[in-house]
């Protein structure tokens, strides 16, 4: 049995942790999986290959924490995050939204979708964008739940890093606090939603992306928030599934 999580958002969801700074990936004896070509493979880095320079991501430590609590299942990540994307690019009917829905539906043929992990907002810190973050994201979240029929599945949103005030790559990043306020409001008002704080987490030298060590901690924060709202009925899905695992040695070549 595979319990899966949809990973969506921009670069800090995809992960830009330096591979050389990260501890070796613990796949929990091969129980941690990643969706590739519609099938489950043992997790490897980078988990979310949106760019050639993708790195570690918080989904790694999240999946490990989940596996430790649920050792009788495999834990699969559905990687659909895309770096640098604005909220408007995730709207219902757009390419990113449809890709996430299609990948999730494919994964749901071989797994039980038990959570959505979202991190996005750096690209929406501009003064003409952040005032509308709450309304836009609320529509996206509700549309995603409807498309996948996951009204009761936990949706965890992560805060933007406070190191953004020191970043010179993008303008208006000091407005991250307003995006965080919108995310916290969403988590408070929407059912089965929680906010994972990024306060105090470290960054790469660019002061835009979380460091490998920070991402490891961030994943545990996501999991802690997930545990607070998940219900047993979500994870106790005994509906028959297709076999999406690698079936022969030659497929590993």
Locations of regions flagged by a protein language model:
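Cell-envelope and extracellular/periplasmic
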Residues: 1-253
């Amino acid at each position: 049995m595979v319990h899966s999580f949809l990973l969506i958002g921009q670069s800090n969801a995809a992960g830009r942790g330096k591979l050389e700074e990260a501890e070796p990936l613990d796949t929990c004896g091969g129980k941690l999986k990643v969706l590739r070509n519609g099938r489950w493979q043992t997790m490897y880095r980078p988990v979310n290959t949106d760019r050639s320079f993708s790195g570690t991501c918080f989904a790694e430590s999240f999946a490990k924490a989940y596996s430790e609590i649920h050792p009788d299942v495999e834990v699969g990540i559905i990687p659909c995050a895309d770096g640098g994307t604005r909220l408007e690019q995730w709207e219902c009917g757009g390419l990113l939204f449809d890709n996430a829905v299609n990948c999730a539906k494919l994964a749901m043929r071989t797994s039980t979708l038990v959570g959505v992990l979202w991190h996005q907002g750096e690209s929406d810190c501009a003064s003409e964008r952040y005032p509308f973050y709450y309304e836009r994201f609320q529509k996206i979240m509700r549309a995603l739940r409807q498309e996948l029929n996951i009204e009761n599945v936990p949706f965890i949103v992560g805060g933007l890093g406070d190191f953004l005030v020191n970043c010179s790559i993008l303008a208006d990043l000091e407005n991250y606090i307003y995006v965080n306020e919108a995310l916290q409001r969403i988590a408070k008002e929407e059912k089965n939603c929680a906010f994972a704080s990024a306060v105090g987490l470290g960054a790469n030298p660019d002061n835009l992306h979380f460091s490998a060590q920070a991402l490891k901690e961030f994943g545990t924060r996501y999991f802690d928030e997930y545990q607070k709202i998940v219900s047993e009925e979500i994870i106790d899905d005994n509906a028959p599934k297709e076999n999406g695992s690698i079936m022969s040695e030659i497929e590993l070549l």
